[in-house]
Amino acid sequence: MTARASGTSGGAVSGIGVDAVDVGRFRALLERRPGVVDRLFTTSEYAYAAVSHDPAPRLAARFAAKEAVLKALGVGIGAADFRDVEVKRDENGAPLLELAGRAAALAAERGVARWHVSLTHTDTVAVASVVAERHR
């Protein structure tokens, strides 16, 4: 399931999720437990962040998006593998979501047809806002 960050909407809102991540705390987690990257992010998500001089804000924004998706689905953190929610970029660089595995199954059960996602980050905070749109 893929979603674009913008475009014409025609369905009803199924769920909304917002999450904020403290970049400093997230950076400290990555330094203390480097293996956590493999549990939270896909290879392409990490590759996108790794080209930055400081990957922590980009990774924190992607983690916020994953949590926001689970909130929009109305489920808890353990309901799906974080790697089942992948933040990609469209041809213009805008974020989009691709769900797989249990996350995709949960979205299908709830009739989610489309996702809208917005990400932002500074050196200190990363925020993601997600809207799940259901079939008409």
Model-predicted regions and their roles:
Residues 1-136:
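Core catalytic alpha/beta fold that binds nucleotide/phospho-ligands
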